[in-house]
């Protein structure tokens, strides 16, 4: 079945940001003892920023909940988890301390290593890729990946006040464009490439 021009364009963009191995059906349609698999997916409830019953919930407590539930649902011992990686963008230190604290709150041993990654708008996905790559290269056998953010406790505008930025940022188009909010960026991308919401939903 042929795809619409917009979906073809989305497929092209996908190839720019994903591994060729991920797109090769030779690797995805057959099973192998070397496959890296995701055995579960767990998330906490969500609420809008500064609203709802979770607006005062600490990120480390939310991570702890996910870690404990992961062990419980899959009948795993904490000591079998060799790596925990969480993505984060807004928190101080990119969530390093919160993830480490959550590890101990959930009764994981100190031998389980912890790392946080900061990649705007896809930090959680980057964490999943990092754990998968460690498994694929035989660095670890099992790990947990995720993402955490509290828009109620950490403002997107922290540190972006014009008076806090160097003048050189406003003299460089690429650097200046980094200040464009993601909502406007998505609108600009859709307009530039003629993408419609229906096509994006179908592709997703």
Regions flagged by a language model, labelled:
Residues 88-94:
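Glycine-rich phosphate-binding loops at beta-strand->alpha-helix junctions
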Residues 80-87:
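Short glycine-rich phosphate-binding loop at a beta-alpha junction
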Residues 8-14, 18-36, 47-80, 95-97, ...:
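Acyl-thioester C-C bond-transforming condensing/cleaving domain
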Residues 39-40, 87, 118:
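Residue-level detector of conserved, well-ordered beta-strand and adjacent loop positions
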Residues 41-46:
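Short polar catalytic/cofactor-binding loops
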């Amino acid at each position: 079945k042929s795809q619409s021009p917009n979906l073809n364009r989305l497929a092209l963009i996908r190839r720019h940001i994903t591994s060729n191995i991920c797109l090769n059906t030779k690797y995805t349609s057959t099973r192998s003892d070397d496959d890296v698999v995701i055995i579960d997916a767990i998330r906490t409830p969500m609420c809008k920023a500064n609203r709802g019953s979770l607006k005062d919930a600490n990120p480390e407590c939310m991570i702890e909940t996910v870690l404990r539930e992961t062990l419980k649902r899959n009948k795993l011992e904490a000591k079998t988890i060799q790596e925990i990686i969480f993505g984060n963008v807004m928190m101080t230190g990119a969530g390093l301390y919160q993830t480490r604290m959550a590890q101990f709150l959930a009764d994981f041993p100190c031998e389980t290593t912890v790392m946080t990654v900061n990649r705007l708008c896809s930090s959680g996905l980057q964490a999943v890729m990092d754990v998968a790559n460690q498994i694929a290269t035989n660095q670890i056998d099992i790990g947990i990946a995720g993402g955490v953010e509290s828009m109620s406790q950490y403002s997107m505008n922290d540190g972006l006040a014009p008076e806090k930025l160097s003048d050189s940022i406003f003299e460089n188009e690429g650097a200046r464009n980094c200040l464009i909010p993601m909502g406007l960026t998505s609108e600009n991308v859709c307009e530039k490439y003629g993408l419609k919401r229906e096509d994006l939903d179908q592709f997703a």
